[in-house]
Amino acid sequence: VKNKSVGIYLTNHQINVNILKTLDKEKNDFDYVYVKLHPHIKKTEDLYQYGLKIVQSNIMVEFLILILLDNGNKLSVFHENSTSVIWFQDRIINKNMGQPFEEYDIVASYIQSKEL
């Protein structure tokens, strides 16, 4: 995938159906929409009703994000307080759908303030 608009949902140990519903509503805003499953998730049949592409791999999501960005894609990342996206805050559209979590905000702010 190169030079496209991509939405990707990074699941936690459980799949948040509300995020799937949001992606289902917004999928026409993207050329591609992916769900990157947490490696512990094995059951996927319920996901196919949303028409989203499933990435079921043990590859670290940071590598997937980096590959998508390096190929010139505009990337919107939907997640729930995932620290995986912190390193890419200046290069992605960060859609944190998680509950407020003070420690996450502190870490994200600290990393964003540094020139890495």
Region spans (language model):
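Active-site donor-nucleotide binding/catalytic segment of nucleotide-sugar enzymes
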Residues: V1-L23, D31-I41
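Short, surface-exposed amphipathic charged segments that create phosphate/polyanion-binding patches used
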Residues: K2-K4, I67-L75, A108-E115
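Hydrophobic beta-strand segments of well-ordered beta-sheets in folded domains
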Residues: K4-Y9, F30-V35, N73-F78, I92-M97
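Short, charged/polar "capping" segments at the starts of alpha-helices
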Residues: I15-I19, I41-L47, E102-V107
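Catalytic binding pocket for nucleotide-activated donors in carbohydrate/polymer assembly enzymes
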Residues: S84-L116
